[in-house]
UniProtKB/Swiss-Prot annotation:
Keywords: Coiled coil, Cytoplasm, Endosome, Membrane, Protein transport, Transport. PANTHER family: CHARGED MULTIVESICULAR BODY PROTEIN (PTHR22761), CHARGED MULTIVESICULAR BODY PROTEIN 4B (PTHR22761:SF4). InterPro entries: Snf7_fam (IPR005024). Its main location: cytoplasm. Residues 9-20 have a biased composition (Gly residues). The gene is CHMP4B. It comes from Gallus gallus. It is found in: Cytoplasm, Cytosol; Late endosome membrane; Midbody. This is Charged multivesicular body protein 4b. It is a peripheral membrane protein. Probable core component of the endosomal sorting required for transport complex III (ESCRT-III) which is involved in multivesicular bodies (MVBs) formation and sorting of endosomal cargo proteins into MVBs. MVBs contain intraluminal vesicles (ILVs) that are generated by invagination and scission from the limiting membrane of the endosome and mostly are delivered to lysosomes enabling degradation of membrane proteins, such as stimulated growth factor receptors, lysosomal enzymes and lipids.
Length: 227
């Protein structure tokens, strides 16, 4: 492909640019410019084809010679248009291939750069020293776990008690509390009640209720007599 690019952009075998072709970015840009130019040419030819077709229809049987000339020009334009379509396809394929190659080149460059950086980072590392460091870390972690376990164990500091004696004392306290509660329930203190006021309650509400009941009975008797 480098030979093709050299011929395309004027780098001859013995010329000044021999051995140094254009950059991928420059070649891609020129291919895009060529595509744009050919696309404009396509639009121009399509308009010319429409114009010649309209002229052929206009003349028709009235001016057969003019109609035939218009159709011939239309055919030439169509042939040029087909050639441009093929050229555009070729240029598009070449541009995409060049873009992919350029992308791959950039990717490889970046990967090589990262590999060098990783190598530089590992230059001061020794696998034996790393193993020793990890072993020291494991030992220190084990020691820390042992210290934590020792600290968390309860220490009596000489205070030893009989569990049975403590349970017996606890039962006595519970029984005393129970007896106290029973005494409070069975023997409450007598609280003097206040004197009831000796006020006569009026009997009007009861009398009114009796009158209402008498009225209801009268209405019921009147209803029964009408039946």
């Amino acid at each position: 492909m480098s030979g093709i690019l050299g011929k395309l952009f004027g780098a001859g075998a013995g010329g000044k640019g021999a051995g140094k072709g254009p950059s991928p970015q420059e070649a891609i840009q020129r291919l895009r410019d060529t595509e744009e130019m050919l696309s404009k040419k396509q639009e121009f030819l399509e308009k010319k084809i429409e114009q010649e077709l309209a002229a052929a229809r206009k003349h028709g049987t009235k001016n057969k010679r003019a109609a035939l000339q218009a159709l011939k020009r239309k055919k030439r334009y169509e042939k040029q248009l087909a050639q441009i379509d093929g050229t555009l396809s070729t240029i598009e394929f070449q541009r995409e291939a060049l873009e992919n190659a350029n992308t791959n080149t950039e990717v490889l460059k970046n990967m090589g750069f990262a590999a060098k950086a990783m190598k530089a980072a590992h230059d001061n590392m020794d696998i034996d020293k790393v193993d020793e460091l990890m072993q020291d870390i494991a030992e220190q972690q084990e020691l820390a776990d042992e210290i934590s376990t020792a600290i968390s164990k309860p220490v009596g500091f000489g205070e030893e008690f009989d569990e049975d004696e403590l349970m017996a004392e606890l039962e006595e306290l519970e029984q005393e509390e129970l007896d106290k509660n029973l005494l409070e329930i069975s023997g409450p203190e007598t609280v003097p009640l206040p004197n009831v006021p000796s006020i006569s309650i009026p009997s009007k509400p009861a009398k009114k209720k009796e009158e209402e009941e008498d009225d209801d009975m009268k209405e019921l008797e009147a209803w029964a007599g009408n039946m």
